[in-house]
């Protein structure tokens, strides 16, 4: 099948360069996670940029099935940390694990006026 738009490059090298050199404002959108089936039905949207205090479920990787609240979003590393998803160091200390938001599902949204405005702007519904 031919390319739909000639304005968009399908060159892998250019796509990777755009991803890894993206400014923080674009990384926010790149760090989006899908909503759970219940939230998707409730709000009428499929995914949202992840933020602190959202509750998530890990759906891929060795920590699959664990739940927790987002404690930090590290845009520079394309990573988020979930407060209950940690690993034990040899000395007994526990350290948070960096996860990519595409491997998470948002189970509870942290709603404030800006988040509500974003949902409405995306064409979603609020209760």
Swiss-Prot record:
Cytoplasm recorded as keyword = yes
Q: Which residues form the signal peptide?
A: none
| Matching Gene3D superfamilies | 2.30.30.30
Top-rank lineage group of the source organism: Eukaryota
Q: Name one GO molecular function term.
A: RNA binding
Q: What is this protein's function?
A: Component of the ribosome, a large ribonucleoprotein complex responsible for the synthesis of proteins in the cell. The small ribosomal subunit (SSU) binds messenger RNAs (mRNAs) and translates the encoded message by selecting cognate aminoacyl-transfer RNA (tRNA) molecules. The large subunit (LSU) contains the ribosomal catalytic site termed the peptidyl transferase center (PTC), which catalyzes the formation of peptide bonds, thereby polymerizing the amino acids delivered by tRNAs into a polypeptide chain.
- Self-association state and partner proteins as the record states: Component of the large ribosomal subunit (LSU). Mature yeast ribosomes consist of a small (40S) and a large (60S) subunit. The 40S small subunit contains 1 molecule of ribosomal RNA (18S rRNA) and 33 different proteins (encoded by 57 genes). The large 60S subunit contains 3 rRNA molecules (25S, 5.8S and 5S rRNA) and 46 different proteins (encoded by 81 genes).
According to UniProt, the name of this protein is Large ribosomal subunit protein uL24B
Phylogenetic classification of the source organism: Eukaryota, Fungi, Dikarya, Ascomycota, Saccharomycotina
């Amino acid at each position: 099948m031919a390319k739909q738009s000639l304005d968009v490059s399908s060159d892998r090298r250019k796509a990777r360069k755009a991803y890894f050199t993206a400014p923080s404002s674009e990384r926010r959108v790149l760090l989006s996670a899908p909503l759970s089936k219940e939230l998707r039905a409730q709000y009428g949207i499929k995914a949202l940029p992840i933020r602190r205090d959202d509750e998530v479920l890990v759906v891929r990787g060795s920590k699959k099935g664990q739940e927790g609240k987002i404690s930090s979003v590290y845009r520079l590393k394309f990573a988020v940390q979930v407060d209950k998803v940690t690993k034990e160091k040899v000395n007994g200390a526990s350290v948070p694990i960096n996860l990519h938001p595409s491997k998470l599902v948002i189970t509870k949204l942290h709603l404030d006026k800006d988040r509500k405005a974003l949902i409405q702007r995306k064409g979603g519904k609020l209760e």
